[in-house]
Amino acid sequence: MKPILLQGHERSITQIKYNREGDLLFTVAKDPIVNVWYSVNGERLGTYMGHTGAVWCVDADWDTKHVLTGSADNSCRLWDCETGKQLALLKTNSAVRTCGFDFGGNIIMFSTDKQMGYQCFVSFFDLRDPSQIDSNEPYMKIPCNDSKITSAVWGPLGECIIAGHESGELNQYSAKSGEVLVNVKEHSRQINDIQLSRDMTMFVTASKDNTAKLFDSTSLEHQKTFRTERPVNSAALSPNYDHVVLGGGQEAMDVTTTSTRIGKFEARFFHLAFEEEFGRVKGHFGPINSVAFHPDGKSYSSGGEDGYVRIHYFDPQYFEFEFEA
């Protein structure tokens, strides 16, 4: 498996995301640049210029018309995907940590950090109502008093959002009323990443407590646990197979004090049902911060602390592989 190396960032990668068809790959890092690449050959299609701080999150809508980014420059920005033009600038009081389009692409949500005396909020804007954008007034704002949100995604059919907190809690918030519908605490430490399955019936969480866990997306019932020896920064579910890929490594601050072999910087593949690890992919120099499966399941990408993104196309052996129970 020879990876395609994407070199477009000067700082460590914070998130990578495919669009729905998987022909484009969006990457953001702790620099102000938002890059978009052709996933088939790793050619850079363009950049979205405008942010002035680290970019924490990126999302593309269903038909890849618009791109949404959230940054530490205290803004969430909406872009025209094709032209790179900035369509909206939503100012916030603190850094924007997570952002996302709902299934229809009409409503956006983003969450802000608890910092500088400001509370953590989840804001909802309806893009069909220009007055909300112009006045920077969301139609709904949910305060999070206890523990800040560290990752969030839209639930099935855009009826709720699923948010992971610094404390390890998972909350399901209604997108209509803002109330907490379900609350569970299966992780003991911060939830770094949440990714849904292709059919949105379940999702996988990646946590600092060295595990990734599988949950039902409506009841938030805990199904499976994938254990490692290192904090897990990101986890993604295969759209075709019962496989989950985990990316992680140590905390960035411990990296220089150990050799790479001890750091365990491989991407690790687990079987979804048996919770057994069956493969590893080396490559990154430093921890992996974000992983994503291509929507056709034939490749996956990872973005690391080293600032590189690697696109891996699976060998034929991967597709013939049968797991012996």
Swiss-Prot record:
<feature type="modified residue" description="N6-acetyllysine">
    <location>
        <position position="264"/>
    </location>
</feature>
<keyword id="KW-0677">Repeat</keyword>
<dbReference type="InterPro" id="IPR015943">
    <property type="entry name" value="WD40/YVTN_repeat-like_dom_sf"/>
</dbReference>
<protein>
    <recommendedName>
        <fullName>Eukaryotic translation initiation factor 3 subunit I</fullName>
    </recommendedName>
</protein>
<keyword id="KW-0963">Cytoplasm</keyword>
<dbReference type="InterPro" id="IPR019775">
    <property type="entry name" value="WD40_repeat_CS"/>
</dbReference>
<dbReference type="GO" id="GO:0045202">
    <property type="term" value="C:synapse"/>
</dbReference>
<dbReference type="GO" id="GO:0001732">
    <property type="term" value="P:formation of cytoplasmic translation initiation complex"/>
</dbReference>
<feature type="modified residue" description="Phosphotyrosine">
    <location>
        <position position="308"/>
    </location>
</feature>
<dbReference type="GO" id="GO:0002183">
    <property type="term" value="P:cytoplasmic translational initiation"/>
</dbReference>
<keyword id="KW-0396">Initiation factor</keyword>
<feature type="repeat" description="WD 4">
    <location>
        <begin position="186"/>
        <end position="225"/>
    </location>
</feature>
<feature type="cross-link" description="Glycyl lysine isopeptide (Lys-Gly) (interchain with G-Cter in ubiquitin)">
    <location>
        <position position="282"/>
    </location>
</feature>
<comment type="function">
    <text>Component of the eukaryotic translation initiation factor 3 (eIF-3) complex, which is required for several steps in the initiation of protein synthesis. The eIF-3 complex associates with the 40S ribosome and facilitates the recruitment of eIF-1, eIF-1A, eIF-2:GTP:methionyl-tRNAi and eIF-5 to form the 43S pre-initiation complex (43S PIC). The eIF-3 complex stimulates mRNA recruitment to the 43S PIC and scanning of the mRNA for AUG recognition.</text>
</comment>
<dbReference type="GO" id="GO:0071541">
    <property type="term" value="C:eukaryotic translation initiation factor 3 complex, eIF3m"/>
</dbReference>
<keyword id="KW-0597">Phosphoprotein</keyword>
<dbReference type="InterPro" id="IPR036322">
    <property type="entry name" value="WD40_repeat_dom_sf"/>
</dbReference>
<dbReference type="GO" id="GO:0016282">
    <property type="term" value="C:eukaryotic 43S preinitiation complex"/>
</dbReference>
<feature type="repeat" description="WD 1">
    <location>
        <begin position="8"/>
        <end position="47"/>
    </location>
</feature>
<feature type="repeat" description="WD 3">
    <location>
        <begin position="144"/>
        <end position="183"/>
    </location>
</feature>
<keyword id="KW-0648">Protein biosynthesis</keyword>
<dbReference type="GO" id="GO:0005852">
    <property type="term" value="C:eukaryotic translation initiation factor 3 complex"/>
</dbReference>
<dbReference type="GO" id="GO:0003743">
    <property type="term" value="F:translation initiation factor activity"/>
</dbReference>
<feature type="repeat" description="WD 5">
    <location>
        <begin position="283"/>
        <end position="324"/>
    </location>
</feature>
<comment type="subunit">
    <text>Component of the eukaryotic translation initiation factor 3 (eIF-3) complex, which is composed of 13 subunits: EIF3A, EIF3B, EIF3C, EIF3D, EIF3E, EIF3F, EIF3G, EIF3H, EIF3I, EIF3J, EIF3K, EIF3L and EIF3M. The eIF-3 complex appears to include 3 stable modules: module A is composed of EIF3A, EIF3B, EIF3G and EIF3I; module B is composed of EIF3F, EIF3H, and EIF3M; and module C is composed of EIF3C, EIF3D, EIF3E, EIF3K and EIF3L. EIF3C of module C binds EIF3B of module A and EIF3H of module B, thereby linking the three modules. EIF3J is a labile subunit that binds to the eIF-3 complex via EIF3B.</text>
</comment>
<keyword id="KW-0853">WD repeat</keyword>
<dbReference type="GO" id="GO:0033290">
    <property type="term" value="C:eukaryotic 48S preinitiation complex"/>
</dbReference>
<keyword id="KW-0007">Acetylation</keyword>
<dbReference type="GO" id="GO:0006413">
    <property type="term" value="P:translational initiation"/>
</dbReference>
<keyword id="KW-1017">Isopeptide bond</keyword>
<feature type="repeat" description="WD 2">
    <location>
        <begin position="50"/>
        <end position="91"/>
    </location>
</feature>
<dbReference type="GO" id="GO:0003723">
    <property type="term" value="F:RNA binding"/>
</dbReference>
<dbReference type="InterPro" id="IPR001680">
    <property type="entry name" value="WD40_rpt"/>
</dbReference>
<dbReference type="Pfam" id="PF24805">
    <property type="entry name" value="EIF3I"/>
</dbReference>
<dbReference type="InterPro" id="IPR027525">
    <property type="entry name" value="eIF3i"/>
</dbReference>
<comment type="similarity">
    <text>Belongs to the eIF-3 subunit I family.</text>
</comment>
<keyword id="KW-0832">Ubl conjugation</keyword>
